[in-house]
Amino acid sequence: MCIRDRFQNDEQNQDLALVLSDLCELADRLPNHIGFYNGVGAGASIPDHFHFQFFQRAPDLPKFPLEERTFSNIDCDFTTTLVEDYPLCVFRWMGELGEVVEKATSWITNFIKTSKFEKQQLTANFIASRSMTSKTVTLYFVPRHRFKQFWNGNAGIVGGLEILGEIVLASNEECNLVRYDIMNFEFIEQGLSRISAPFTTDKADEL
């Protein structure tokens, strides 16, 4: 399934529900892992090459910064929540597998239809995990502007890990940011803010 086509071309009729169902079902089967699906301009390293990526949680890092943030309700049935005090606009659903997929699919479909931006400008990150102590599945949705993808000028693609709050350094120049004490929490916050799509906040306010 191609999130780019889902956003860009209704004739493709890609099934968002299937993407979310597959991602969340895999997360449900892998409770000690976290998985993500990146769209074009949102961390997909090879154009038109779409796949789920899962990795096992490190014992010394049980939670990522995003997972520790507070989320507030933005709809009347209290199922869709929006992150507070974070450099990116992130929506979250929590619950049993089927409920999460159903609620998220409905809400995101409406989000796409009512967005004031053209569909070819829209992309997204989806991140899913399952609780170690219960059957609660968590799904994050990060709507993105596909031409805003770098945290460091014209380098440093923001994908699933960066959304979670972990910056991946892929070059000597980026590693020097740590070596010379330039990389700190404020620097990371500013970098992630560069790819935040303003329309998402507007949409959250409207909803």
Regions found by a protein language model. Give the residues of each.
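Conserved, mostly hydrophobic/aromatic
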Residues: 51
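Conserved His + Asp/Glu catalytic blocks
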Residues: 9-21, 26-46, 55-207
